[in-house]
């Protein structure tokens, strides 16, 4: 009798334990499934973000290439001395864009090249692609290796400043074909920067040059008009502090 009683109690204890272990196994399985679902969803989200970024970068590259190639074609038709490099996004002027030794202004041919290229750059900036990606034009003046670093730095700054002055100074011959609206756009788009003798060419003559470097917005950059500098309209005639050869 006692043996049967103990046997019943033992079976009841076993029967009470079985559902507990089954529920624990089910819980672990459910947690594993949940973990896999979360992991798959996370990987899918990351993959989609990468694909969107790659597609955005591809679209950006295509837009910039289309803009630059169109600018290159127009420049070639207007003035053969204007060289548009769509690989480095640079505009140079060959021998017309070279400075004499220790001088910071271009000759008549170089001024003519500037006069021809500026409307083309402004047109590119106002294009559909330009409105999305065109950030600014950096005017870079280069020197040869003669003289000290600081001397050449000052000279390169003068050269890039002179190019900017030739676009905005009221005494410059280039002013004849630049409207007040274009002047305002030049002030927003163009930036003068000195480079000294970095990126020297094969000869000293070729090193003494000016180039225009096109910069474009990246995917993460936001072209917010609220952040743009609001330049006042030109009331008085702009006068450069450098000597402007007439």
From Swiss-Prot:
GO terms for biological process: defense response to virus. SUPFAM superfamilies: OmpA-like. Residues 86-218 form the OmpA-like domain. It is a single-pass membrane protein. It is found in: Cell inner membrane. GO terms for cellular component: plasma membrane. Disruption phenotype: When this gene is missing the Zorya system does not confer resistance to SECphi27 in E.coli. This is Zorya protein ZorB. It comes from Escherichia coli O139:H28 (strain E24377A / ETEC).
């Amino acid at each position: 009798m006692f043996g049967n009683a103990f046997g019943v109690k033992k079976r009841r204890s076993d029967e009470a334990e079985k559902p507990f272990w089954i529920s624990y196994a089910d819980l672990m399985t459910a947690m594993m499934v949940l973990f896999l679902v979360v992991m798959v969803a996370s990987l899918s989200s990351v993959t989609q973000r990468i694909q969107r970024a790659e597609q955005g970068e591809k679209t950006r590259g295509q837009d910039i290439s289309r803009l630059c190639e169109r600018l290159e074609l127009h420049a070639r038709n207007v003035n053969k001395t204007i060289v548009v490099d769509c690989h480095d996004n640079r505009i140079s002027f060959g021998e017309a864009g070279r400075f004499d030794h220790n001088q910071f202004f271009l000759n008549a041919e170089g001024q003519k090249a500037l006069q021809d290229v500026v409307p083309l750059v402004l047109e590119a900036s106002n294009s559909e692609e330009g409105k999305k990606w065109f950030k600014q034009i950096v005017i870079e003046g280069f020197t040869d290796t003669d003289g000290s670093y600081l001397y050449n730095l000052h000279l390169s700054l003068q050269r890039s400043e002179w190019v900017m002055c030739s676009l905005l100074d009221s005494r410059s011959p280039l002013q004849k074909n630049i409207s007040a609206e274009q002047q305002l756009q030049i002030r927003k788009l163009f930036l003068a920067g000195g480079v000294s003798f970095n990126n020297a060419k094969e000869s000293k003559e070729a090193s003494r040059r000016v180039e225009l470097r096109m910069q474009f917005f990246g995917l993460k950059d936001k072209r917010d008009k609220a952040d743009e500098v609001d330049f006042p309209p030109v009331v008085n005639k702009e006068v450069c502090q450098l000597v402007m050869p007439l």
